Amino acid sequence: MATIQVRDLPEDVAETYRRRATAAGQSLQTYMRTKLIEGVRGRDKAEAIEILEQALASTASPGISRETIEASRRELRGG
């Protein structure tokens, strides 16, 4: 496993992470590890939009209506 060290983190940010870790009943290391993994493995907005656009472009039915996909895409784009 890799080790990551973050330097020059503002104290208020570090304190917020410490509080959140405590509230979650986790060590700071465990909490930060979980958040980093979730951040990478979760889909971001651009990835979600790309998936929707691929579904719209495909000839096979994605199982939902084109209107639903387009509405979801508009919502993800903030408009």
Swiss-Prot record:
Q: State the signal peptide span.
A: none
UniProt keyword annotations, A-Z: Toxin-antitoxin system
Q: What InterPro entries does the annotation carry?
A: FitA-like_RHH (IPR053853), Ribbon_hlx_hlx (IPR010985)
Q: Which GO biological process categories is it annotated with?
A: regulation of DNA-templated transcription
User: Which Pfam families does the entry link to?
Assistant: FitA-like_RHH
**Domain of life according to the entry:** Bacteria
What is this protein for, i.e. what is its function?
A: Antitoxin component of a possible type II toxin-antitoxin (TA) system. The cognate toxin is VapC1.
What name does the UniProt record give this protein? Putative antitoxin VapB1
- Its gene? vapB1
